[in-house]
Amino acid sequence: MAEEKLSARTQLPVSAESQKPVLKKAPEFPILEKQNWLIHLYYIQKDYEACKAVIKEQLQETHGLCEYAIYVQALIFRLEGNIQESLRLFQMCAFLSPQCADNLKQVARSLFLLGKHKAAIEVYNEAAKLNQKDWEICHNLGVCYIYLKQFDKAQDQLHNALHLNRHDLTYIMLGKIFLLKGDLDKAIEIYKKAVEFSPENTELLTTLGLLYLQLGIYQKAFEHLGNTLTYDPTNYKAILAAGSMMQTHGDFDVALTKYKVVACAVIESPPLWNNIGMCFFGKKKYVAAISCLKRANYLAPLDWKILYNLGLVHLTMQQYASAFHFLSAAINFQPKMGELYMLLAVALTNLEDSENAKRAYEEAVRLDKCNPLVNLNYAVLLYNQGEKRDALAQYQEMEKKVNLLKYSSSLEFDPEMVEVAQKLGAALQVGEALVWTKPVKDPKSKHQTASTSKAAGFQQPLGSNQALGQAMSSAATCRKLSSGAGGTSQLTKPPSLPLEPEPTVEAQPTEASAQTREK
């Protein structure tokens, strides 16, 4: 009993620390987004090989469930031109996160780049349900509708985009719609609003200047092109347009000086060499003109205006077989232009192929309802063939067109045209019915065709991209990463960028002044 009491007294108290259970180390679960910061860093540094290596490692660790890694890999595939593979990866992202509008926007963009515009519109509409206030979705829908030629729907979507957020690119695309419709006044109105919103945008200023130039409003054209050169003295489009205006007014030396500046920036520009060639043509340096036009034709073999000018220069040099070659090629690309058939008929007449010349004149008369040169040249051919009755009919038709032009405009007719018309009228014995009664100096005994110069009044301007950018490209304006959204490790994805047009007008038309004679 005494021993039990002794042992009870000698017992030590148990430590509180020893009573605590031993803590086990927590298991390490794989974090899907732990390498996102590194992927983001390599991507914005454009170190795509290192970026792809990290993405591969990340996808192996996460068994292909890291959405951001898949997203960036899809962006890299798109940059490398592998659009189909990028579409597949973006569709995976949309499957992993179906409520994310950015994923759907990128799927739609890939479909757009593949030319599947209807499918892209469907996906953009799905994205719009998730985010109704995204200007980019409305903008890209408008661009898709433009490619489908549904201009009214495109116009509505672009107006919605401007209502949500005003952007230069949306104004440009809206202006393109009116240009494609042929409504220059509406296009100018849109571009004026765009310039008010962004007065230092040289692309907008240049396009607006070219539109005024196309309408013959030279003062405003000079003003806007001058503003372009104020902000960007090396803007080759504005310099080329300014040189074209000087060339149109016959100041060939100053125009060539301007073109020399442009040549330093864009040496392989078809409109540049076309305009230089026509400057030499205006200076009557025909060999140099042909050399420059041949270079333009090499750079743009499908441009009918360059072929037209080559045919015109060869006609002037009396190289009728070469003229026939280039004019025939131009007709293949522009079969609805009556003046091309008229020049082809002049070449055929000088090649002594009267039957085909008549056919060409008949086609020219059918297509061109307002150019009196066509009827006058046809009348000369018929008179020389002894068909005076038909020649008289063409001469009278020419008189009707001349009278109509006199009343509707203050156009000055080419002196050679007046001379030939007077001689032919006298030969046909129309007498008092002559349109022109002005006496002619130094009459010649042989009937000649009228000039195709200054008619110019009737000629279409001959430049190389007159229709101010009719095609839109799918390239993006910039490649930015937007600021981070919620979450600590998940980075915000690079946005699906708005679709933009190709660079607009390269050059404004040049004049083509030549004197072609039918012998």
Curated annotation (Swiss-Prot):
Its main location: cytoplasm. Keywords: Cell membrane, Cell projection, Cilium, Cilium biogenesis/degradation, Cytoplasm, Cytoskeleton, Flagellum, Membrane, Protein transport, Repeat, TPR repeat, Transport. It is found in: Cytoplasm, Cytoskeleton, Microtubule organizing center, Centrosome; Cell projection, Cilium membrane; Cytoplasm; Cytoplasm, Cytoskeleton, Microtubule organizing center, Centrosome, Centriolar satellite. Belongs to the BBS4 family. GO terms for biological process: centrosome cycle; cilium assembly; protein localization to cilium; protein transport. May be required for the dynein-mediated transport of pericentriolar proteins to the centrosome. Required for microtubule anchoring at the centrosome but not for microtubule nucleation. The BBSome complex is required for ciliogenesis but is dispensable for centriolar satellite function. This ciliogenic function is mediated in part by the Rab8 GDP/GTP exchange factor, which localizes to the basal body and contacts the BBSome. Rab8(GTP) enters the primary cilium and promotes extension of the ciliary membrane. This is BBSome complex member BBS4. It comes from the Eukaryota. GO terms for molecular function: protein-macromolecule adaptor activity. GO terms for cellular component: centriolar satellite; centrosome; ciliary basal body; ciliary membrane; cilium; cytoplasm; motile cilium; pericentriolar material. PROSITE patterns: TPR, TPR_REGION. Residues 439-519 are annotated as: Disordered. Part of BBSome complex, that contains BBS1, BBS2, BBS4, BBS5, BBS7, BBS8, BBS9 and BBIP10. Interacts with PCM1 and DCTN1. Interacts with CCDC28B. Interacts with ALDOB and C2CD3. Interacts with PKD1. Interacts with CEP290. Interacts with DLEC1. It holds the Pfam family TPR_8. InterPro entries: TPR-like_helical_dom_sf (IPR011990), TPR_rpt (IPR019734). The gene is BBS4. Signal peptide: none annotated. Gene3D superfamilies: Tetratricopeptide repeat domain. Residues 1-66, 338-519 are annotated as: Required for localization to centrosomes. TPR repeats lie at residues 67-100, 101-134, 135-168, 169-201, 203-235, 237-269, 270-303, 304-337, 339-371, 379-417. The lineage of its organism: Eukaryota, Metazoa, Chordata, Craniata, Vertebrata. Residues 461-476, 510-519 have a biased composition (Polar residues). Residues 101-337 are annotated as: Interaction with PCM1.
